[in-house]
Amino acid sequence: MANITNEFMGHDMLAPFTAGWQSDMEPLVIEKSEGSYVYDINGKKYLDTLSGLWCATLGGSETRLVEAANKQLNTLPFYHSFWNRTTKPSLDLAKELLNMFTANKMAKVFFTNSGSEANDTQVKLVWYYNNALGRPQKKKIIARAKAYHGSTYISAGLSGLPPMHQKFDLPPPFVLHTECPHYWAYHLPGETEEEFSTRLANNLESLILKEGPETVAAFIAEPVLGAAGVILPPATYFDKVQTILRKYDILFIADEVVCGFGRLGTMFGGDKYNIKPDLVSVAKALSSGYMPIAAVLVSQKISSVILSESNKIGAFCHGFTYSGHPVACAVALEALKIYKERNITEVVNKISQKFQEGLKAFADSPIIGEIRGTGLALSTEFVDNKSPNDPFPYEWAVGTYFGAQCAKYGMLVSSTGDHVNMAPPFMLSLEELDELIRIYGKALKDTEKRVEELKSQKK
């Protein structure tokens, strides 16, 4: 097939998370998907090791999801959920989500279209809740450095990634950031994981006391930081954090957008770390990425106050045209059925051991500082001298080069700076996993050679 991507150079999209110079290059245009693979418009086949953007957990050709969408489109393609009007798929999905989440008793579900909107909604819920309780000063939200919570105004402010703040006048003044719990990168010499967790918890408490506990409303955290590079919490971290939050009556918002529905080998990421949140955000795997949908799970403690207050003032005035879209809800319901029928956490745990061990076998590479992960999520961090304090020069673009070599050999990864994320579909076969490990090794060998060349030029 002739190469036809040139016709899309200088295309008309203002693309997300894309620099201007990239718009003058040929874009990678994906045309179709099949299982764990995607194909570009020239017919080249790629193993998709990021499940699109952490979401296509059931791969790209799950006919049951397509059939669920078609059936709903032929029955009721759209109706809204405003003014106590709704649809059966949205009611059924809300009930199913409440039944599935067992770490804490949740009472209500609010539907949005993306994880960003879900986390934006969380902040408005928290504010509404505290206003209803007569605590208008209790509005600040504590997030963490390196976290990713979305790209709307509030969710981008919550995110602890400077490029998401620069030129956007972010973060807003009501958002505070505490430290990233990355033990490998930030522990002191001789400090154990538990001691590191204690130090971070003490610093969190100091921040709360400095701001005034009466002004701090909530703390938001991903069980495992995803986009930041699959950063796992150190031992006892969340136990200590939750003790402090309870002490000062601060709500816990669990951002399960990446971790939820089996990614870490548990149905929700918080199950792995004994997290008992007041509010939960879910998205991505909720529909396996087949339809845009997200949800906020609200505890009885919060929903009862919100509903009571709305009776006094006339309404809870927040929502989106497509909240609880019937087609998206029908697809999500079918995805959740598949997860249950196939015992998806068992599937993930079965294949994840080989996934983690197969890739961590490359950890001795002189250009790798750390390979970290759990379940079907893994990140490789490239550094010099195997030290977090010795990053490669920015212009060397080591992670980007590795990602380009993976693509050359037929595999797509996420390269952000000098860390590379992988989160493959749950239905990845053992043969596909062998292919993943083989291509990773080839791309790593190329990258090691490239770094040696750059070092020799620098001398």
Curated annotation (Swiss-Prot):
The keyword Transferase applies. GO terms for molecular function: adenosylmethionine-8-amino-7-oxononanoate transaminase activity; pyridoxal phosphate binding; transaminase activity. Optimum pH is 7.0-8.0. GO terms for biological process: alkaloid biosynthetic process; biotin biosynthetic process; gamma-aminobutyric acid metabolic process; phenylpropanoid biosynthetic process. Pathway: Aromatic compound metabolism; phenylpropanoid biosynthesis. Expressed in placental tissue of immature fruit. It is an enzyme of class 2 (transferase). It catalyses: vanillin + L-alanine = vanillylamine + pyruvate. Its EC number is 2.6.1.119. Residues 428-459 form a coiled coil. Disruption phenotype: Low pungency phenotype, characterized by low levels of capsaicinoids, and accumulation of high levels of capsinoids, which are non-pungent capsaicinoid analogs. Keywords: Aminotransferase, Coiled coil, Pyridoxal phosphate, Transferase. It holds the Pfam family Aminotran_3. Pyridoxal 5'-phosphate binds at G115, S116, D255, F320, T321. The modification N6-(pyridoxal phosphate)lysine is found at K284. Involved in the biosynthesis of capsaicinoids natural products, pungent alkaloids synthesized from phenylpropanoid intermediates in the placental tissue of chili pepper fruit acting as repellant on herbivorous mammals and conferring spiciness to hot peppers. Can transfer an amine from vanillylamine to pyruvate forming vanillin and L-alanine. Can use pyruvate or oxaloacetate, but not 2-oxoglutarate as amino group acceptors. Is able to convert (S)-1-phenylethylamine into acetophenone in vitro. Belongs to the class-III pyridoxal-phosphate-dependent aminotransferase family. NCBIfam families: PRK06105.1 (NF004767). This is Vanillin aminotransferase.
